[in-house]
Design a protein with these regions (language model features):
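Short, charged, surface-exposed secondary-structure boundary motifs
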Residues: 16-17, 66, 88-92
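Tryptophan-rich aromatic "cage" segments
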Residues: 145-155
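Bilobed "Venus flytrap"/periplasmic-binding protein-like clamshell domains
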Residues: 1-45, 134
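Generic non-transmembrane alpha-helical segments
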Residues: 108-118
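A ligand-binding cleft/hinge motif common to bilobed small-molecule-binding domains
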Residues: 24, 49, 54-74
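Periplasmic-binding protein-like
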Residues: 71-107, 120-142
Length: 155
């Protein structure tokens, strides 16, 4: 009779990675008595804390920021496990930007982190790295694997 809160059906950390973790265990089974769409990770965590649901899945960035800056929002909660690895959220810009413009952006962002260590610490960032579609293919692989195991959506 476990109830789940996920922020949205198109969430990587809130849905895709959890589905991938559960899919090989259930194979065509429903894991949850209820699945609630919360609209965001903070709301999902609040739903668990309030007893509205028993489980949610949030990204490590959100959880880490809360540990550092709002630990009271994690009162009464604990981490049960971790998902398969996933790339970080991408920075997105226009298709019309040149390679030089993209390089300049990364240089400026990384220089800012070096020159403003307090900002880097607040954001919990060490550096910005360029990434391409190939870095995110693993997420589609996770989706396909879950579908292949008969678990196309959390239920």
């Amino acid at each position: 009779n476990t109830r789940l809160a996920l922020n949205d059906h198109d969430s990587n950390s809130g849905m895709n990675l959890l589905r991938h973790a559960l899919a090989p265990l259930g194979r065509d089974s429903a894991f949850f008595a209820e699945v609630h769409i919360s609209g965001g990770h903070l709301r999902s965590l609040a739903m668990v804390a309030a007893g509205e649901v028993e489980l949610t899945s949030v990204d490590a960035v959100t959880f880490g920021y809360l540990q550092l800056h709002a630990p009271e929002r994690l009162d009464g909660l604990r981490v049960l496990g971790r998902s398969a690895p996933s790339p970080a959220l991408p920075l997105i810009t226009s298709l019309h930007w040149s390679a030089a413009q993209r390089r300049e952006l990364f240089e400026a962002l990384n220089l800012t982190l070096i020159e403003c260590p307090h900002l880097a610490a607040t954001l919990a960032l060490k550096s910005f790295l360029p990434a391409g579609e190939e870095h995110y293919r693993i997420l589609l692989d996770y989706e396909r694997q879950a579908q292949g195991w008969g678990y196309p959506q959390l239920r």
